[in-house]
């Protein structure tokens, strides 16, 4: 069965990609399976300089998902270009760089840096990380700022730009429209929902950062609703994510309005989850009367 999907800058052999921050730069996972099986890889965030991230503890399990406040730990954009991208480029898969910053200038610098390499196929612009003190969140919650940073990155980069939206907003459609107007080639949605967990013996927040981003199956219905709403109003492609653990979840995302998907937290529970989903997808599509990914995308106008 044909699982391929064509998106701006991306010829995906299948619509499954590990989500940013849940796959590092693929090194550890490459010991489990051949990364060429994946539609693409969404790399961990890149900032201008190396970041050590937030103090620990910075991850916690909750009764319905996972909280994290990693704080964009990464070795800095030049290290990523010099060492991580060449290692990933050996695989026959698309590479998407996730870029972050605490100022417009930093986003511009990081976006322009990736022009050095043709091995990166597209940028995912993270305007939505809730766990960095300086800036970050203001780009993801204010349509004016989101538009501005998208415009600057589009101008600085020679690659298609997918803007990753935060669910921590009142009106997701307004955010999506703002970045579409600014020239975004696609959307990536959603990032984590801000949450908190209390450590009972100390009566303090369990995560050192106090709050963290909630991910995993708990956020899937929120993501599906937001993608559905945005799909009605915006015409650029959407890479959907949030709590995907199975091929059925992928189909739900595609029908709601996504064009491809990313799998995040589930990789921590089952390192083979992306390959398992890719293997199961043809049977699940067939079961629900579809004969390709394109077929689902074409027919969803009727179903939704
Ligand atoms: C540990 C962890 C680190 C993450 N780091 C990033 C990141 O660096 N950049 C980014 O855009 N999103 C990051 N995310 C968000 C994920 O890419 C994804 O949008 C979110 O977790 C929802 O998908 P999921 O429920 O499948 O995990 C991170 C998520 C987790 C759990």
Curated annotation (Swiss-Prot):
EC number: 1.3.1.14
Record-linked PROSITE patterns: DHODEHASE_1 (PS00911), DHODEHASE_2 (PS00912)
Keywords recorded for this protein, A-Z: Cytoplasm, Flavoprotein, FMN, NAD, Oxidoreductase, Pyrimidine biosynthesis
Transmembrane intervals: none
EC class name: oxidoreductase
Cofactor(s) essential for the protein: FMN
Record-annotated active site: 129
Main localization of the protein described in the UniProt heading: cytoplasm
Compartment(s) where it occurs, according to its Swiss-Prot or TrEMBL record: Cytoplasm
GO biological process terms on file: 'de novo' pyrimidine nucleobase biosynthetic process; 'de novo' UMP biosynthetic process
SUPFAM superfamilies: FMN-linked oxidoreductases
UniProt-annotated binding residues for FMN: 20, 44-45, 98, 126, 164, 190, 216, 242-243, 264-265
Domain of life of the native organism: Bacteria
Catalytic activity: (S)-dihydroorotate + NAD(+) = orotate + NADH + H(+)
Any one cellular-component term (Gene Ontology): cytoplasm
Binding, substrate: 44, 68-72, 126, 191-192
Pathway as given in its UniProt record: Pyrimidine metabolism; UMP biosynthesis via de novo pathway; orotate from (S)-dihydroorotate (NAD(+) route): step 1/1
Record InterPro entries: Aldolase_TIM, DHO_dehydrogenase, DHOD_1B, Dihydroorotate_DH_1, Dihydroorotate_DH_1_2, Dihydroorotate_DH_cat, Dihydroorotate_DH_CS, Dihydroorotate_DH_I
Keyword NAD: yes
Subunit structure: Heterotetramer of 2 PyrK and 2 PyrD type B subunits.
NCBIfam families xrefs: PRK07259.1, pyrD_sub1_fam
Role summary: Catalyzes the conversion of dihydroorotate to orotate with NAD(+) as electron acceptor.
Protein's recorded name: Dihydroorotate dehydrogenase B (NAD(+)), catalytic subunit
Organism: Oceanobacillus iheyensis (strain DSM 14371 / CIP 107618 / JCM 11309 / KCTC 3954 / HTE831)
